């Protein structure tokens, strides 16, 4: 199997400043986990209401009045369209994300809650493959039409 850097060099034009990375060597570090991601949204209030009331996340405010949604040891930082913070993605676009969120709550309970909240289920429950094993998932959309997958690991030892 070829290293990612070598695959990139064959399939895409690699910027010249990355040419030193194109050897078979690995970086001198290892990524451990995702700390946060950024969603660009059309309306902060609608997004916060959805993620807190429908998905049970906690709304937080940090530096300079910025908004985030916390869950577990991760968070989702929110940027409002046209008011993004720098640095930002090249093309910050509402509705372009596809997120998989893990819960220990049985999906039957999740589905019942989604129905009470009036949130349509796009698909599921269906079997999928998560980062560390098999999962069962339901799919829904947030107010910006991002695809949200809520999942249970099939084995209890894969929960964290």
Curated annotation (Swiss-Prot):
Family affiliation: Belongs to the glyoxalase I family.
Limits of the VOC domain: 33-153
Organism name: Xenopus laevis
UniProt-listed Pfam families: Glyoxalase
InterPro entries to which the protein is assigned, alphabetical: Glyas_Bleomycin-R_OHBP_Dase (IPR029068), Glyas_Fos-R_dOase_dom (IPR004360), GlyoxalaseI/FosfomycinResist (IPR050383), VOC (IPR037523)
Transmembrane segments: none
Disulphide-bridged cysteine pairs: none
Protein name (Swiss-Prot/TrEMBL): Glyoxalase domain-containing protein 5
Gene transcribed to yield this protein: glod5
Gene3D superfamilies documented for this protein: 2,3-Dihydroxybiphenyl 1,2-Dioxygenase, domain 1 (3.10.180.10)
């Amino acid at each position: 199997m070829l290293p990612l850097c070598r695959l990139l060099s064959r399939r895409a034009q690699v910027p010249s400043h990355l040419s030193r990375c194109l050897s078979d060597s690995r970086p001198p570090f290892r990524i451990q986990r995702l700390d946060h991601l950024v969603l660009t949204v059309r309306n902060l209030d609608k997004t916060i209401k959805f993620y807190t009331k429908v998905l049970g996340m906690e709304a937080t405010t940090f530096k300079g009045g910025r908004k985030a949604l916390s869950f577990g040891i991760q968070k989702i930082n929110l940027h409002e369209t046209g008011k993004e913070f720098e640095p930002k993605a090249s093309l910050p676009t509402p509705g372009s994300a596809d997120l998989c969120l893990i819960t220990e709550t049985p999906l039957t309970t999740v589905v019942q809650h989604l129905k009470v909240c009036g949130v349509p289920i796009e698909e599921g429950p269906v079997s999928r493959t998560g980062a560390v094993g098999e999962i069962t998932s339901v799919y829904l959309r947030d107010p910006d039409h991002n695809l949200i997958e809520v999942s249970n690991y099939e084995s209890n030892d894969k929960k964290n």
